[in-house]
Amino acid sequence: MSGWRKIYYKLLNLPLKLLVKSKVIPADPVSELGLDPSRPILYVLPYNSKADLLTLRAQCLAQDLPDPLIPLEIDGVQLPSHVFIENGPRVFRYYVPKQESVKLFHDYLDLHRNNPALDIQMLPVSVMFGRSPGREGHGTPHLRVLNGVQKFFAVLWLGRDSFVRFSTTVSLRRMASEHGTDKTIAHKLARVARMHFSRQRLAAVGPSLPARQDLFKKLLASKAIEKAVADEARSKKISHEKAQQNAITLMEEIAANFSYEAVRLSDRVLSWTWNRLYQGINVHNAERVRQLAQDGHEIVYVPCHRSHMDYLLLSYVLYHQGLVPPHIAAGINLNFWPAGPIFRRLGAFFIRRTFKGNKLYSTVFREYLGELFTRGYSVEYFVEGGRSRTGRLLEPKTGTLSMTIQAMLRGGTRPITLVPIYIGYEHVMEVGTYAKELRGAIKEKENLLQMLRGLRKLRNLGQGYVNFGEPLPLTTYLNTHVPQWRDAIDPIEAQRPSWLTPAVNDLANQIMVRINNAAAANAMNLCSTALLASRQRSLTREQLLEQLDCYLQLMRNAPYAKDTTVPDKTPEELLNHALNMNKFEVEKDTIGDIIILPREQAVLMTYYRNNIQHLLILPSLIASMVMYHRRITRTELLHKISMIYPMLKAELFLHYSKEQLPETLDTLIDELARQQLICDKGSELVLNPARIRPLQLLAAGVRETLQRYAITLSLLSATPSINRGALEKESRIMAQRLSVLHGINAPEFFDKAVFSTLVATLREEGYISDSGDAIQEHTLEVYNMLSALMTPEVKLTIESVSMPAETSNQPEAPETPETPETPEPEGKTES
């Protein structure tokens, strides 16, 4: 590099250091993209911009990557370590292809031809200042590159809203070996790079935004809304103009009013907020979503719903991953001042709880959603329909998902891909309200006062987690499961073919399973699981650390799913972090520390335990079986677990099929044996008295679930002809009674939805016949197996209410073998 150029770069770097604060995507490019800093890297940028080059250089030095300003010297030949695909625009002329890039690619390919050991990494990098998509009808294309004057103002105003996006490398060795080294390959490389950068920019910026009134005019002109307006005028006996005005009013109520400036401002506010409230936001598998966006997919984000914070957190995360914040389906209850107008500008569109009896509303909403897909906007909706009050996934509401498929049946949309997302927190600000609502309190309507009260509670929120699950391409799904789906395409009428409902139900279930597959274990939910497993809600520090280690080893050595994330910290680090959250009490004595979960916190902590209950349910069930039997064969264990697995699978959205269950249980058994929680004697599994305490705590994780199943099965066995409504109601009443008598502090224990799912599963599995009567022989077999795993007191409470005298005289389960006295782990007892 010449001396003058060095001086020029140094002078240019001074204002850039002050004005530019760019974000790197991905956050750790070396590990996430598999870069090898020891091998030569050729940086490829879209067009000639010294500001972009110096911004890239600053990030490369921060990431310990080679300096793009230092040339590469290979086999005595010195070549630049960066290349611009285009020359870039000048103030008075638009850009033209820069042939130097083709020549440089050709020179590098030639070096590979002459040196078989050489393998240069070609690393595409784009630097963006600002993310405004622009408005439709404006003459300047939003994908334009900037000339020198425009770049100056972009850096001045948007230097702190910039990012450096590293892409996956291309091996020049592979290119040379597979495609040759002549000039046509160099031309092809340059052409592919141009397409890559164009797609990448579109994925980051999104399509142009329409003027709101222009959008309404287009919707009004659609055949479906024209027909709905005519029907509205006829059915309500009003004029066509009045019916049309009703449609416009509904559009005003529904439609977002997306503003890039609002997003940019909210990013500043949220960055400040997250940094003060949270100790970190952990994001996993975002690269798969970036790739989908770059490949031109229409993305529908379907996260679980824990808190009102979800809306803001997910948009914030996506924005910082270099993606366009989505249009978000929000409940109409959030459309209050000032939140409603703010959310609208951040991309929210509002949806009523029910569409029943309002054909015009359902048509307008469906057409608006279809228009979002047609224009290429990403969309987000919560498939559960509302926030989970228990910490578990709710049964999915399929209305919006059904409309998504109906949008495909209009024809003409890009490929739609559903992206399940797990959102987790170490502290949910509404958890106290949830507990009150589950105890019968009436849900407060959202308003400004409630929002301000909630903001007052925002402190010490620990860590947040956003895990992107395995994407579900709709076209691929329909091609596999409904090959004839294209026969139903109709651009005017909303179609409801016979296959739609079963397909939507299956898709919804798959989404929930994939959300659970991407669950995040953390300090709070692991500590809550251990302490709630102790009847006294307290453990010594040593016992709690031992139990945390048991959970961590299970999750690491026998992982639930490839997308599940487990903390990489030690049990000591996790416990110290949890104690800093001020949810637990520590009582010190001369022997050591006792960690206590206070009574008033116990119900709240079940929320966090329930977030990961599905990860530990099968190990807990194995532990429970071994605890009771003391000695059991693998075959017998598999048989017993297989009887109740369909209920667990439906309730907790587990991903193992019946065919996968034996292998899964073997893997878990091997891990429990490795931890010496049980002894594997080949054909038999035997209790290990020396490790009974952690086994006992592990077994407690499934205790309440089995008791709930026993309640319903005992009622079915006692009254085989009981109808579904009565069965669910009686089960809930008995569960409430059991929770009072035996101190069960879990609100979901008598949750209506849980019993509804259980009864539906019993019918599907053949425990209830087509006539509606229970098959007593089957229900008694499962009940006897379950009741044997419960304490005599709990069993007596259930049977005293549900089982008639003659049923109680049925042959009993084998008598519980004597077990050594295994006192509860030491800790503070309840007063």
Curated annotation (Swiss-Prot):
Q: Report motif location: HXXXXD motif.
A: 304-309
Top-level lineage group? Bacteria
The UniProt catalytic activity note for this protein reads: sn-glycerol 3-phosphate + an acyl-CoA = a 1-acyl-sn-glycero-3-phosphate + CoA
Q: Which organism is it from?
A: Yersinia pseudotuberculosis serotype IB (strain PB1/+)
Keywords in alphabetical order: Acyltransferase, Cell inner membrane, Cell membrane, Lipid biosynthesis, Lipid metabolism, Membrane, Phospholipid biosynthesis, Phospholipid metabolism, Transferase
Q: Which InterPro entries match?
A: GPAT/DHAPAT, GPAT/DHAPAT_C, GPAT/DHAPAT_LPLAT, GPAT_PlsB, Plipid/glycerol_acylTrfase
Please list where the region (Disordered) is annotated.
801-831
Q: Its Gene Ontology biological processes?
A: CDP-diacylglycerol biosynthetic process; fatty acid metabolic process
**Enzyme Commission identifier(s):** 2.3.1.15
PANTHER family associated with the record: DIHYDROXYACETONE PHOSPHATE ACYLTRANSFERASE, GLYCEROL-3-PHOSPHATE ACYLTRANSFERASE
Membrane-topology descriptor: Peripheral membrane protein
Pathway note: Phospholipid metabolism; CDP-diacylglycerol biosynthesis; CDP-diacylglycerol from sn-glycerol 3-phosphate: step 1/3
**Where does this polypeptide localize?**
Cell inner membrane
CDD domains attached here? LPLAT_DHAPAT-like
User: What information about domains appears in the record's comments?
Assistant: The HXXXXD motif is essential for acyltransferase activity and may constitute the binding site for the phosphate moiety of the glycerol-3-phosphate.
Q: Name one Pfam family in it.
A: GPAT_C
Identify the GO cellular component terms for this protein: plasma membrane
* Protein name stated in the entry: Glycerol-3-phosphate acyltransferase
Q: What is its main location?
A: membrane
Q: Does the keyword Transport apply?
A: no
Q: Does the keyword Lipid biosynthesis apply?
A: yes
Entry's family note: Belongs to the GPAT/DAPAT family.
So where does this one cross the membrane? none
The record's section on HAMAP family has: Glyc3P_acyltrans
Q: Name one GO molecular function term.
A: glycerol-3-phosphate O-acyltransferase activity
